Amino acid sequence: TFKSKNGAYVREHFFGRYPETAALVADMTDDEIWALRRGGHDSEKLYAAFHKAQTAGKPVVILAHMVKGYKIPEAESKNTAHQSKKMSLESLKSFRDHFQLDIKDEDIPNYPYITFPEGSEEYNYLHGRRKALNGYLPKRLPKFTTEFKVPSLEEFAPLLEEQARPISTTMAFVRFLNTLLKDKDIGKQIVPIVADEARTFGMEGLFRQIGIYNPHGQNYVPSDRDLVAYYREAKDGQVLQEGINELGAASSWLAAANSYSVNNLPMIPFFIYYSMFGFQRVGDLMWAAGDQLARGFMIGGTSGRTTLNGEGLQHEDGHSHIQSLVIPNCVSYDPAYVYEVAVILQDGINRMYGEKQEDVFYYITTLNETYEQPAMPKGAEEGIRKGIYKFETVEAKGDKGHVQLLGSGAIFRHVREAAQILANEYGVSSDVYSVPSFTEVAREGADAVRWNMLHPTEKARVPYIAQVMNDAPAVAATDYMKLFAEQVRAFIPAQSYHVLGTDGFGRSDSRENLREHFEVDARYVVVAALHELAKQGKFDAKVVADAIAKFGLKTEILNPLYA
């Protein structure tokens, strides 16, 4: 306000508030008061502040008071500075004169770029400062030049086989991580980052194996010192245990994820956290990660609206994949099985750190639900990477109809269960597809459609999902909002497509009850499939109604979106 007025106004309303301050300018004219500079525009004061900061021995914050729109006559210290799209000719001349810039009147309308002649005092000063700082910043390598050996998928062979006992996909990630950490070539370049207690994810074994990083070492005796996997901190520790500090953990991840470019030292950061507390809390940093061409893995553990049960609205994530898909170079997956996790992680390392060095980063959701883990079907590897593959075909006697069933993550097992019910009780056969990434499938499909539009005289490209699927009615079910699976609707060849999802707030209840509440369990998949077949005339509507009654589905309750 003061700088938008004049010296007399400043005398009355600033200095004149108290007799002591009024006396300070009693012998000054209004023009002299008006000429007083704010600290941020006073080179002597700035120099003094920086000089004092040099000797502080600790971080120093310099608060510099400045004027908005400085030396722009019509905008100086006015809120209209935010609305100014360009400076008038007179403002430019005034700006030039004040800062003593060597620009002729006739050149001002062209906004000439100001350079300093080589050898001039200004030129030598600027380059001298850069030399003193060991180079010019920002300086980024588009690709690192150091040697980096990408592990082959065969090195994770145990994860591709049927597991001896039920385990979760989060445990599959931990086993993959353990194998990486033991790799003699790149083990030291792995950066595990945890934003909460690592024991939540079964990672306590890393405490003894590689330790928790603490620059001061361990200065206390942890309460679990008598355990094998006690809370071991060390100066050479490798795990970054950030506590409940997602912003700090994401910042550590960003630093490691950009090390390939800034330091020519590729690091592979794995930031694992409750999936609800990732993009929802640090979404701006993840957008920055895309902007900065970061490389690494975000692991959304304990994911799924109905899978992290009993935690209610705060923890039950059914939309992180919606948030991740808005970042163009974030590659997202929601794997259902251990072998899918292994294929996706190895492929991610190869894409980001292999020969091509793609500028992408990965978001992978993993589960805390344990269940039987089959071996990888023959020929599934390519489909896992691309986002969809046929897991199985379930034949039925009677041939009363055929459907296609799609699913991902925790709900895929319910999709498989539905296929068996359809075959055994309704004579309906099905093709069952695992869709580790609806997002990648949709992106590839959109890319094909765009290419076809721009190349009308050439042979049209067929979206990958259209190559994999057929034209039978399709039903998709996931542990995420319907929008997640809806992404692929435009690209599937199916005659109809019905999507089930978990739109709405979470609940504190059992997984069984939550999946009933959100209408994504096997019974709802069956009813949705019968409904699609009935629309085609394959079944009478009464068959669908009888199935609803048989399964005890509640038809008059509020839509879970609003419940």
Place the predicted regions along the sequence by residue.
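Thiamine diphosphate
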Residues: 1-374, ...
